[in-house]
Every structure is written in structure tokens, then in C-alpha cells.
């Protein structure tokens, strides 16, 4: 009766056995197989089977679950500093206010300029000029002091205008636009001054006395009355 080892060796094919040592006749270690053999092996799917399997129903439920929508915050518009449009009544009020500024600085500048001129003349710095004028020195000094005051008075409107626009700079652009339109209407509707006379003087040729919309309408009536009176005198 054959031994179990001999029976096992006889049953194994000769190609799958190699010598392990000179003393051992054959070894049970099989030779290395190419990688292509693994692809044909029935155990390939079991060897490379993923360790964790995801249930199909669970994955479908997760995919069908609505994703939370990301709401983008819309930027809030910055508060605009746009001023309301300037109406005509407000324009005339600002115009009257500007005229008061001009008058105030005319008076102030006239007083300060006259005082400064008097102090300057009292030092005797203008004595060579005064001696050449064929008038009484006191009268000459008085006239020169009045000249200094007049220069201060004339500079008042320019200074007052600048101060007014510094304090009301937000209305400067709109006032400039309105003023251009206003003077264009004055120029278009005013009468011809060449036809004026002592009995029929020109009514406010530059529109300086207009201080409201009602005042402008009254100014238009005065222009029409001037033209009617001119026609009546001509006939």
C-alpha cells in the first residue's frame, strides 16, 4: 500500500512542482503565474471585492434628497446723497439770501477798507501824492478815504458770493443751472431800452427785483405794459 505523500505527488501534475532543495524530491510550492492568469481566475472578484458595500436604496435616497440652496446675500444699496431738484421758489429764496450776504459784506468791507485807508493816510506815507493835488489837504485825505471805502464796497459782492456758496455748496450746481435759464428768459422777454423815455422808463431791465415766481409774473406784466405804452405814444 502506497504512503499518502507518494499518492499526493503522483496525483499533482509535474509542471506545477519545483525542487525546493537537493534533498527533497519535489516541493508543493507552485511556480509564479503571470498576471494574465489572475484575470481568468474565478477568485478575482472575491479578491478585489470592496470591503464596504453601500446599499443601493440608501444611495438613491441620499441622491434624491434636496440639497440645501445657498442664498447669496444681495448687497444693500448705499444711501445716496442725491438732493431733490431745486424748484423755482426755492431758487428765488436762495437768490435773496445770497443778495443779503453780498450786501452784508459790502457794508463790512467798506467800513474796514475806509478805516484802514484812514490809518494808512494818517501815517504820512501818501504825503508826496497829496502835495501834488491842487486841493486842500484835508479834502484830499477825505476823498482818498472815501476811495478806500468804495473799493471795499465793490469787493463785498464777490466775497459774499464766495461765502454763500461755501455755506450752501450742495445747491451751487443747481443754482448755476437755474440762473442760466432765468437770465435767458429775462433776456428773451425784456423790452428794448432804446424806446424808453422819462415818462416810460424801463421796468427792471436785469430782473434784479424778482424774488419769487409771482414777482416774475408781475415783471412780465410790466414789460407788456411798457410795450403798450410805447405803442400808444407812437400812435
From Swiss-Prot:
The keyword Mitochondrion applies. It is a multi-pass membrane protein. Residues 1-61 form a transit peptide. The keyword Transmembrane helix applies. GO terms for cellular component: PAM complex, Tim23 associated import motor. Its main location: mitochondrion. One of its GO terms (biological process) is protein import into mitochondrial matrix. It is found in: Mitochondrion inner membrane. It comes from the Eukaryota. The chain crosses the membrane at residues 103-123, 133-153. Keywords: Membrane, Mitochondrion, Mitochondrion inner membrane, Protein transport, Transit peptide, Translocation, Transmembrane, Transmembrane helix, Transport. Component of the PAM complex, a complex required for the translocation of transit peptide-containing proteins from the inner membrane into the mitochondrial matrix in an ATP-dependent manner. Belongs to the PAM17 family. Component of the PAM complex, at least composed of mtHsp70 (SSC1), MGE1, TIM44, PAM16, PAM17 and PAM18. This is Presequence translocated-associated motor subunit PAM17, mitochondrial. The gene is PAM17.
Amino acid at each position: 500500500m502506497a504512503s499518502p505523500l507518494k499518492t499526493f505527488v503522483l496525483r499533482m501534475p509535474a509542471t506545477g512542482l519545483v525542487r525546493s532543495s537537493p534533498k527533497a524530491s519535489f516541493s508543493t510550492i507552485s511556480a509564479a503565474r503571470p498576471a494574465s492568469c489572475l484575470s481568468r481566475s474565478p477568485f478575482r472578484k472575491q479578491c478585489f471585492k470592496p470591503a464596504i458595500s453601500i446599499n443601493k436604496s440608501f444611495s438613491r435616497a441620499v441622491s434624491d434628497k434636496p440639497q440645501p440652496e445657498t442664498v447669496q446675500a444681495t448687497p444693500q444699496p448705499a444711501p445716496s446723497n442725491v438732493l431733490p431738484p431745486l424748484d423755482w421758489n426755492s431758487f428765488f429764496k436762495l437768490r435773496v439770501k445770497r443778495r443779503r450776504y453780498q450786501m452784508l459784506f459790502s457794508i463790512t468791507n467798506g467800513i474796514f477798507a475806509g478805516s484802514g485807508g484812514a490809518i494808512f493816510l494818517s501815517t504820512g506815507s501818501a504825503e508826496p501824492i497829496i502835495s501834488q493835488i491842487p486841493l486842500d489837504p484835508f479834502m484830499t485825505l477825505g476823498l482818498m478815504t472815501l476811495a478806500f471805502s468804495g473799493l471795499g464796497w465793490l469787493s463785498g459782492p464777490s466775497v459774499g458770493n464766495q461765502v454763500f456758496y461755501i455755506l450752501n455748496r450742495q445747491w451751487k450746481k443747481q443754482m448755476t443751472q437755474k440762473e442760466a435759464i432765468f437770465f435767458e428768459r429775462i433776456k428773451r422777454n425784456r423790452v428794448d431800452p432804446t424806446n424808453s423815455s422819462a415818462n416810460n422808463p424801463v421796468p427792471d431791465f436785469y430782473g434784479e427785483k424778482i424774488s419769487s415766481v409771482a414777482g416774475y409774473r408781475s415783471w412780465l406784466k410790466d414789460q407788456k405794459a411798457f410795450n403798450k405804452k410805447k405803442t400808444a405814444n407812437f400812435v
